[in-house]
């Protein structure tokens, strides 16, 4: 194996394998199951389907009495139900909560923000005090810059190998063996 191909192979292996300190302590996945958060996708039918009805969330309470917060929550639920009748959706089934007096709809979370999104508070107040240092880089920044440098070196190597002088040098080597 020639030295340039060894260098390319070493660069690719170094970029693929995580370096020391970059291995996650817990395996990360894009889907995390949490019992208290449920995302339900409900298809919205067109206005031509006549049998579609909406149902308000089912409330659970031990004594059957509504407290002040439950009454306020029921009022909000009734307002939401009135708004939902203008835009009917299919019934996903009865939604009940294991907690006292809370609707199951409160457990539904909104979709997560995009991958590169950072809230403004994180940008203004970094979590690590070393982040203010000009010599501190997080792992993702180092990996991105490393990939950029590797790509530039790879393309530069290809340009050098395919330039006229390298072709002349290889012809000189071939002529020497004759």
Swiss-Prot record:
Biological-process GO terms, alphabetical: positive regulation of sodium ion export across plasma membrane; potassium ion transport; sodium ion transport
Family matches, as Gene3D superfamilies: Single helix bin (1.20.5.780)
Region span, Disordered: 21-126
Bilayer topology term: Single-pass type I membrane protein
Intracellular or extracellular location(s): Cell membrane; Basolateral cell membrane
Alphabetized InterPro entries for the sequence: FXYD_motif (IPR047297), Ion-transport_regulator_FXYD (IPR000272)
Keyword annotations of the record: Cell membrane, Ion transport, Membrane, Potassium, Potassium transport, Signal, Sodium, Sodium transport, Sodium/potassium transport, Transmembrane, Transmembrane helix, Transport
UniProt cross-references to Pfam families, sorted A to Z: ATP1G1_PLM_MAT8 (PF02038)
Purpose of the protein: Associates with and regulates the activity of the sodium/potassium-transporting ATPase (NKA) which catalyzes the hydrolysis of ATP coupled with the exchange of Na(+) and K(+) ions across the plasma membrane. May increase NKA activity by increasing the apparent affinity for Na(+). Involved in down-regulation of E-cadherin which results in reduced cell adhesion. Promotes metastasis.
Name used for this protein in its record: FXYD domain-containing ion transport regulator 5
Organism: Rattus norvegicus (Rat)
Lineage: Eukaryota, Metazoa, Chordata, Craniata, Vertebrata
